[in-house]
């Protein structure tokens, strides 16, 4: 999981 993907997760 990339940093950008983690942001979209929230």
Curated annotation (Swiss-Prot):
What biological processes does GO assign it? Answer: neuropeptide signaling pathway
Q: Does the keyword Secreted apply?
A: yes
- Enumerate the UniProt keywords alphabetically: Amidation, Neuropeptide, Secreted
Tell me which GO cellular component terms the UniProt record holds: extracellular region
Which of the residues bear the PTM Phenylalanine amide? Answer: 10
Location in the cell reads: Secreted
Source species, domain of life: Eukaryota
Q: Does the keyword Secreted apply?
A: yes
Similarity section? Belongs to the FARP (FMRFamide related peptide) family.
**What name is this protein filed under?**
FMRFamide-16
| Source organism of the structure | Sarcophaga bullata
């Amino acid at each position: 999981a990339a940093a950008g993907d983690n942001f979209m997760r929230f």
